[in-house]
């Protein structure tokens, strides 16, 4: 858990900006039953963190 928190804090601004512009898409992912790991992977790929 601490590792995830450190990761989010270090990537906070980019993650916030991405989420703000893609909130509808993330909501659709959640409604369709996407798992935390899938969403994390999609976000990492979208931001080029992978």
Swiss-Prot record:
<dbReference type="GO" id="GO:0031640">
    <property type="term" value="P:killing of cells of another organism"/>
</dbReference>
<keyword id="KW-0078">Bacteriocin</keyword>
<keyword id="KW-0204">Cytolysis</keyword>
<keyword id="KW-0044">Antibiotic</keyword>
<keyword id="KW-0929">Antimicrobial</keyword>
<feature type="modified residue" description="N-formylmethionine">
    <location>
        <position position="1"/>
    </location>
</feature>
<keyword id="KW-0291">Formylation</keyword>
<dbReference type="GO" id="GO:0005576">
    <property type="term" value="C:extracellular region"/>
</dbReference>
<dbReference type="GO" id="GO:0042742">
    <property type="term" value="P:defense response to bacterium"/>
</dbReference>
<keyword id="KW-0964">Secreted</keyword>
<comment type="function">
    <text>Has bacteriolytic activity against Gram-positive bacteria B.subtilis, L.lactis and M.luteus and several species from genus Staphylococcus including methicillin-resistant S.aureus, with MIC values ranging from 0.11 uM to 7.8 uM. Has no activity against Gram-negative bacteria or fungi. In vitro, has a dose-dependent cytolytic effect on eukaryotic cells.</text>
</comment>
<protein>
    <recommendedName>
        <fullName>Bacteriocin BacSp222</fullName>
    </recommendedName>
</protein>
<keyword id="KW-0614">Plasmid</keyword>
């Amino acid at each position: 858990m601490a590792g995830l928190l450190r990761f989010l804090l270090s990537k906070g601004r980019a993650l916030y900006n991405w989420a703000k512009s893609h909130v509808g898409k993330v909501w659709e992912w959640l409604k369709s039953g996407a798992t935390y790991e899938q969403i994390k992977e999609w976000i990492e790929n979208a931001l080029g963190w992978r």
